[in-house]
Amino acid sequence: DFRRYLHKNLEDFIIETPLENSLELLNNKFDQSQIKTVQEKWKPYNFKNQNIDDFLQNLNIDKTVEISSINGGYSNALKQLNKFIDNGYEDYAKFSSNPSKEASSQLSPYFHSGQISTHEVFEKISNLESWTLESIDPKMVGRREGWWGSTENFESFMDELITWRELGYHTCVRRANYDQYSSLPEWAIK
């Protein structure tokens, strides 16, 4: 099953985290032909003398969609992570699926739009629990609980952060109809 596969292959990815300033490796050596192609498709726009309200009115977007109550950006994502650690994490395993309790991380919109990295969240929660690779219990491979060798909250949160996110990602990549009701398995429809 997927969890068993993930447990057997995850350690390398936990050890090898993204570089903090990976774009610096480019040394500003962009392929000029790619830049030209992008500029031909999306013409550069000078906003200096533009009335922003007029500009937005002319965009072909659904203007009935209301403004989100969630403030985006990295600093707000970090505030939400800290709020979760201070107010929800201690009850995560028990109440994360209960919408009337404030135990879920509420980080999904920040993950979705790339405003905070799962690697950063993993590192912060791991440090909170003093978790290390040596904590892993290889006898628990494939099990929902116990493999991480940590607290119930840590086990539950990592199952969501890593296992279910990866499963969702791979489902979207491998199933053309992932966004259709007909793609749901029979057990989920019931």
Model-assigned labels for residue ranges:
Residues 3-188:
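Glycine/tryptophan-enriched, flexible segments
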